[in-house]
Amino acid sequence: NKATVHATVNEFWYVLEGRGEIWRDNGAESSITVLVPGTSIDIPAGTSFQYRNVSGVDLKFICIAMPPWPGDSEATFIKGIWEPTI
């Protein structure tokens, strides 16, 4: 996907199927986390992030956003570490 940063929304993910990676950068620390079934991660507001599928199986996860999504101006696309495929 395209690398993104949210202005006010925090996200929490729980991976259901597939295998992937997520890059997160909060300005002080940058990391890549492997996403496999059972993995839980958080993406605090203001954190740059980008994820990708690294298997032939769809990457499926539950995403909870808090507070509720305020509108189109919430997400800003940025330059990530991987070339987006969608």
State each model region's role.
Residues 21, 29, 70:
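Flexible, glycine-rich phosphate/dinucleotide-binding loops
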Residues 2-4, 22-23, 43, 49-56, ...:
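Short beta-strand His + acidic residue motifs that chelate non-heme Fe in jelly-roll/DSBH
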Residues 26-45:
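Short acidic-glycine-tyrosine-enriched beta hairpin
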Residues 5-22, 64:
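Short, conserved beta-strand element in jelly-roll/cupin
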Residues 8-9, 19, 28, 47-48, ...:
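A generic "binding-loop/recognition-motif" signal
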Residues 52-86:
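Double-stranded beta-helix
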Residues 1-3, 9, 32:
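Vicinal oxygen chelate
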